[in-house]
A protein has these predicted regions:
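Surface-exposed amphipathic alpha-helices with a cationic face
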Residues: 1, 19, 40-47, 97-107
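Active-site beta->alpha loop and helix N-cap motifs at the rims of alpha/beta catalytic domains
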Residues: 1-9, 17-30, 36
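Hydrophobic faces of well-ordered beta-strands that scaffold small-molecule active sites
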Residues: 5-8, 26-28, 51-56, 76-78
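Glycine-rich beta-to-alpha transition loops that act as phosphate-gripper elements at the mouths
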Residues: 7-12, 32-33, 54-62
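Catalytic cores of alpha/beta
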Residues: 13-21, 58-76
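A contiguous pocket-lining binding segment that forms or flanks enzyme active sites
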Residues: 24-27, 39, 46-51
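Glycine-rich phosphate-binding active-site loops on the catalytic face of alpha/beta enzymes
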Residues: 27-36, 72-92
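C-terminal helical cap(s) of enzyme catalytic domains, especially alpha/beta-barrels
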Residues: 69, 85-107
Length: 107
């Protein structure tokens, strides 16, 4: 059984190390502190092969996710904008489910 490893990287050195050990997808974290979309665009210049997954502070909004994909991100992670809610409320879980479905459909 194989395990797929997606490392979290914040520097070019870390990205190159991940690539050297065979990682195809690389999580860029924390993207909100590294410069956001501009950082990904800058990385793609010297690293056109980079299959980046930005993570950290990305809003659960279809247009924002689409923007990330349009600049070359292979996927995005969405956490805090979904999980800062009250999970004791069943409606909250349904709301999260609807948000995720919406994000996937508008890709």
């Amino acid at each position: 059984k194989k395990t797929y490893y997606i490392p979290g990287c914040a520097t070019v050195s870390e990205i190159l190390k991940a690539r050297s050990i065979g990682c195809e997808l690389i999580k860029i974290f924390p993207i909100n502190l590294l410069g956001g979309k501009k950082f990904i665009k800058t990385l793609k210049g010297p690293l056109p092969w980079l299959k980046a997954i930005p993570a950290g502070g990305i809003e659960a909004n279809p247009e924002i996710v689409k923007d990330w994909l349009n600049i070359g991100a292979k996927a995005v992670t969405i956490g805090s904008s979904l999980y800062n809610k009250d999970f004791s409320n069943k409606n909250t879980l349904l709301e999260i489910e609807k948000t995720l479905i919406s994000l996937m459909q508008k890709r």
